[in-house]
């Protein structure tokens, strides 16, 4: 695992993170009712589903686990039977006290009465598991993606959230595409709302994030990939081709779309993550921005680049021979018009040069910290 200083984007400070309802006054007849409303407490009671969550996490005896929102402790016990150490963060003081009493017979369980979003990830590899409150799902996903030593994150979320993030609708979110070189996103299965108490208004799902053993992109290449994805998800242009043409030459864009099997009129949300990587493979020319100069000595658009810089003087001298001054002026005027067209051709030629050389494909490496490329905090994206 890579160290935290390899992360291009620093983690937010602990004091910047907290449960959104922590300090909000909530009405209720009893403290229990108020806490359930304030902290979004819907407890999963189905033991079969609980066992399925623990199984999906694929825990190892040597791997510590962090859990958010243990509730009544049913999942916590299941995790403790499979992991070396389980640290459960419960923000509700009443529940935290009850859990410590219930789980006192499990020496490898630690109950922490604190907001999970303020926790620091352990320095060693670990797994995250939790049936998390719907209201802080995005914040917890962000926390997991930014944790430099996390291996997997298995969580119960709203069904809609899980489907949007894992492409279950055939659409992909910006967050998923941005982090795909570092993490796999997997929709595991639906969880019926009737398995919770109190029964929520919507169904849930088990979703898993798994850090790739070898990143598909890393370092500067990852940053350029994120920049490309960000460009397309801005909503400017109306389709993926129009968005890409804001930065990349037309011929290279057309070749990249063909290489990835993506139609020019495609909406970005319908482009699969692996297609984004194939697009990047063809588009990535870090040393040749749009409108840049081609390499010396390369012929561009049928004209030598040096000829364009001279404005056609040498050609004019050779072509006019013994013509009088008026003929040379007329010939020069014609050459200037032609030179203007050739400059346009030259830009096309630069695109052709960029397509022919310097292609960079997805590369493996040792980096696992990775910049997840998220913008913003809580709130579904």
UniProtKB/Swiss-Prot annotation:
Q: Which domain of life is it from?
A: Bacteria
| Record-listed S-adenosyl-L-methionine binding positions | 42, 44, 69, 90, 115, 131
Q: Which SMART domains match?
A: rADc (SM00650)
Q: Does the keyword Transferase apply?
A: yes
> Any idea what this protein is called?
rRNA adenine N-6-methyltransferase
Instruction: State the organism's lineage.
Output: Bacteria, Bacillati, Actinomycetota, Actinomycetes, Pseudonocardiales
Which GO biological-process labels does this protein carry?
response to antibiotic
* Catalytic reaction annotation: adenosine(2085) in 23S rRNA + 2 S-adenosyl-L-methionine = N(6)-dimethyladenosine(2085) in 23S rRNA + 2 S-adenosyl-L-homocysteine + 2 H(+)
Q: What does this protein do?
A: This protein produces a dimethylation of the adenine residue at position 2085 in 23S rRNA, resulting in reduced affinity between ribosomes and macrolide-lincosamide-streptogramin B antibiotics.
* Biased composition annotated in UniProt, kind: Basic and acidic residues: 1-19, 301-358
Per UniProt, the ranges with Gly residues bias are 359-381
Q: Which UniProt keywords apply?
A: Antibiotic resistance, Methyltransferase, RNA-binding, S-adenosyl-L-methionine, Transferase
Enzyme Commission number(s) from the entry: 2.1.1.184
Q: Where is this region: Disordered?
A: 1-42, 282-381
Q: Which family does it belong to?
A: Belongs to the class I-like SAM-binding methyltransferase superfamily. rRNA adenine N(6)-methyltransferase family.
Q: Which GO terms describe its cellular component?
A: cytosol
An example molecular function term from Gene Ontology annotations: RNA binding
């Amino acid at each position: 695992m890579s160290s935290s200083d390899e992360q291009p984007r620093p983690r937010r400070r602990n004091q910047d993170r907290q449960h959104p309802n922590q300090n909000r006054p909530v009405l209720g007849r009893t403290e229990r009712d108020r806490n359930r409303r304030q902290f979004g407490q819907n407890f999963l009671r189905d033991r079969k589903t609980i066992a399925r969550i623990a199984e999906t996490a694929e825990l190892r005896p040597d791997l510590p686990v962090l859990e958010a929102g243990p509730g009544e402790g049913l999942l916590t016990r299941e995790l403790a039977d499979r992991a070396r150490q389980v640290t459960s963060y419960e923000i509700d003081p009443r529940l935290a006290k009850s859990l410590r009493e219930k789980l006192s017979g499990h020496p490898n369980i630690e109950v922490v009465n604190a907001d999970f979003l303020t926790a620091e990830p352990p320095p060693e590899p670990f797994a995250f598991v939790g049936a998390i409150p719907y209201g802080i799902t995005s914040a917890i996903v962000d926390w997991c993606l930014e944790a430099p030593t996390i291996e997997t994150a298995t969580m119960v979320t709203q069904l809609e959230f899980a489907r949007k993030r894992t492409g279950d609708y055939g659409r992909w979110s910006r967050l998923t595409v941005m982090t795909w070189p570092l993490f796999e996103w997997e929709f595991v299965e639906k969880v019926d709302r009737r398995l919770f108490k109190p029964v929520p208004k919507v169904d849930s799902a088990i979703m898993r994030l798994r850090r790739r053993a070898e990143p598909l992109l890393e370092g500067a290449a990852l940053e350029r990939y994120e920049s490309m994805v960000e460009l397309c998800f801005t909503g400017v242009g109306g389709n993926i081709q129009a968005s890409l043409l804001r930065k990349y030459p037309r011929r290279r864009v057309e070749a990249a779309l063909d290489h990835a099997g993506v139609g020019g009129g495609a909406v970005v949300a319908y482009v699969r993550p692996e297609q984004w990587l194939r697009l990047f493979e063809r588009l990535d020319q870090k040393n040749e921005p749009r409108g840049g100069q081609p390499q010396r000595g390369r012929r561009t658009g049928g004209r030598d680049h040096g000829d364009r810089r001279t404005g056609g003087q040498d050609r004019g001298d050779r072509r006019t021979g013994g013509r009088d001054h008026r003929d040379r002026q007329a010939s020069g005027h014609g050459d200037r018009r032609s030179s203007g067209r050739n400059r346009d051709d030259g830009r096309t030629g630069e695109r052709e040069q960029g397509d022919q050389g310097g292609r960079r494909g997805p590369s493996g490496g040792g980096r696992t910290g990775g910049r997840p490329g998220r913008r913003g905090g809580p709130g579904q994206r």
